[in-house]
Amino acid sequence: DIDALLKMADRGNKIMLVSSSFTKLLEDTLKFDCTYSYFRSVDLKKYAASLLKRDSIYWIGDPKVYPQQIFRFYPQFCKSYFRQYDSLPVRKLAEIDLAKDMGNALDELDSTTVSRNYHPLVAMVRPWGKGEVVLVSTPLLFTNYGVLDEKNATYIFRILSQIGELPVVRT
């Protein structure tokens, strides 16, 4: 129940929501929009067996806590991202680079437009009352495929560290 979660955050708790499909009510309440992606295991199997390039997720969170770093994941895990989140304050954690797929088509655009539209966030923190809501659009990164792949567990631990000393309950 969204109301119950937001009341917890309002009282000072930290809530982490990891999904590639958030409810419209949650998106409207927290003023964000997330793309939806469909996962096909067949595509992952084909991709994993090849030597194709992986997608990059850039850690852009507080550099005093963690240095900026690039993590490489199978593209099938990084298809969802936040398109709109500007109307309320957010703390940016991680973004994906969509500009590489556009080639020279972006040459005519200014850097602000490119940054906003082609470097969308995949993880962010939205303040809510006395607490926070951590939003992550890449749930498949939290599976064994994502955690056990190369050095990517570091990315997952950085996301989870946003909860701090509070207990983590997975549902």
Locate the predicted segments by residue.
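Short, well-ordered loop/turn elements at secondary-structure boundaries
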Residues: D10-R11, W128-K130, I163
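Short acidic/polar capping segments at secondary-structure boundaries
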Residues: S21-T23, D97-A99, L140-F142
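Extracellular ligand-binding/catalytic regions of CAZymes and related secreted enzymes
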Residues: L140-T171
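Long, contiguous hydrophobic alpha-helical segments, chiefly transmembrane helices and signal peptides
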Residues: A9, L17-V18, L135, L141-F142, ...
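Membrane-embedded segments
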Residues: D1-R54, R116
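A structural signal for short, well-ordered beta-strand segments and their strand-loop junctions
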Residues: M16-S19, L135-V136, P167-T171
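Catalytic beta-strand/loop cores that center a nucleophilic Ser/Cys/Thr
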Residues: S50-G129, V134
